[in-house]
């Protein structure tokens, strides 16, 4: 909301007061700043009651809100017409014009009068809508909104007129002068004709993979590049270098402890000489490992057959084997003999291996 100038002030205003109170002869427009010369003033035109309005213009005149108990400070709140209100007003004017020609179309005058009364009633209701009184346009005691008692009241009708320099002296008496502050409420609603999707082309598809708002990360496992952009990639690379460096330092320290000799030097030849000899002294480590791990499966099968034959021959022959007497009955017990024979065969296999 903003304070408007006198050029946009309404032509007529009205003030509600009790019948036994004195009226204010004129109202000066409070523009929030000192003005050397007042160019416009609201002069008291007449005083009427609510039942004796002579015209529709008087009944729809803006009503001032009392903002001080001395009945000399008022507030006029009016709403700026939006585009929709202007269109509605034009539509009503067009309908009214069409209604005025109904009689020419041959309709009865009673129906014509009913249509005109309906249009006037809707127009008057729309114009007489009022908002709640505001308390923030005056400071101090003036900020208190005074409510009138429910007694017999009248309306003072004021007319906006230009004031001349020679008429200023007539309104020097402060008791007969009041003040009105005109406040305009600006409708900040979004324009109906503006489309928020107007800037986007019809050829653009929001579901398209190449749409500018659809940004898919290349590496879903590493979210650092998404959060930090190119800096995140540099941080990730730096972290990998740090891990590699730590692993190298750990291996180096372990290697130094393992191969450092008593004389303080690295005895590499003594530590890994045996391993080098087993690999055949070859630079190709893989080939050396394969050649040193050659397994003769035929020879192993022959050894297994020989050992099995020896075991079978031992079981068939009456051989001597050491006896173990764990119990007094082991001397003549056949199970004890069989047990000692098995122990003897197992011991022979252990000795061969």
From Swiss-Prot:
Phylogenetic placement of the source organism = Eukaryota, Fungi, Dikarya, Ascomycota, Saccharomycotina
Quote the InterPro entries the UniProt record gives: Iwr1, TF_Iwr1_dom
Name of the protein this chain belongs to: RNA polymerase II nuclear localization protein IWR1
Ranges of biased composition (kind: Basic and acidic residues)? 77-92
Source organism of this protein record: Saccharomyces cerevisiae (strain ATCC 204508 / S288c) (Baker's yeast)
Recorded phenotype for the gene knockout or disruption? Leads to a K1 killer toxin hypersensitivity and pleiotropic effects on gene expression.
Keywords, sorted A to Z = Acetylation, Cytoplasm, Nucleus, Protein transport, Transport
> Where in the cell?
Cytoplasm; Nucleus
Subunit note: Associates with RNA polymerase II. Part of a complex consisting of RPB1, RBP2, RPB3, RPB4, RPB5, RPB7, SPT5, DST1 and IWR1.
General remark: Present with 1080 molecules/cell in log phase SD medium.
Q: Does the keyword Cytoplasm apply?
A: yes
């Amino acid at each position: 909301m903003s304070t408007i100038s006198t050029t946009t002030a309404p032509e007529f205003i009205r003030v509600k007061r009790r019948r036994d109170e004195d009226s204010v002869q004129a109202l000066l427009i409070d523009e929030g700043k000192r003005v050397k010369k007042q160019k416009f003033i609201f002069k008291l035109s007449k005083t009427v009651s609510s039942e004796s309005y002579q015209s529709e213009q008087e009944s729809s005149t803006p009503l001032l809100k009392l903002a001080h108990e001395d009945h000399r400070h008022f507030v006029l709140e009016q709403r700026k017409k939006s585009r929709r209100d202007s269109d509605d007003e034009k539509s009503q004017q067009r309908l009214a014009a069409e209604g005025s020609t109904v009689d020419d179309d041959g309709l009865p005058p009673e129906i014509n009068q009913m249509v005109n009364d309906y249009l006037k009633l809707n127009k008057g209701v729309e114009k007489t809508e009022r908002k709640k009184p505001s308390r923030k346009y005056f400071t101090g005691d003036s900020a208190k909104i005074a409510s009138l008692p429910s007694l017999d009241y009248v309306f003072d009708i004021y007319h906006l007129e230009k004031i001349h320099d020679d008429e200023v002296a007539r309104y020097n008496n402060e008791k007969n002068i009041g003040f009105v502050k005109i406040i305009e409420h600006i409708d900040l609603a979004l324009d109906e004709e503006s489309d928020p999707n107007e800037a986007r082309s019809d050829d653009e598809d929001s579901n398209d993979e190449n749409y500018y708002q659809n940004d898919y990360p290349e590496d879903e496992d590493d979210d650092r590049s998404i959060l930090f952009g190119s800096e995140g990639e540099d941080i990730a690379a730096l972290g990998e270098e740090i891990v590699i460096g730590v692993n190298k330092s750990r291996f180096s320290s372990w290697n130094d402890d393992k191969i450092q000799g008593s004389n303080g030097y690295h005895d590499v030849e003594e530590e890994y000489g045996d391993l080098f000899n087993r690999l055949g002294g070859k630079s190709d480590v893989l080939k050396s490992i394969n050649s040193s791990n050659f397994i003769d499966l035929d020879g192993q099968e022959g050894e297994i057959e020989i050992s099995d034959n020896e075991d079978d021959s031992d079981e068939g022959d009456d051989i001597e084997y050491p006896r173990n007497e764990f119990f007094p009955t082991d001397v003549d017990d056949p199970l004890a003999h069989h047990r000692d024979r098995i122990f003897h065969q197992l011991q022979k296999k252990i000795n061969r291996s």
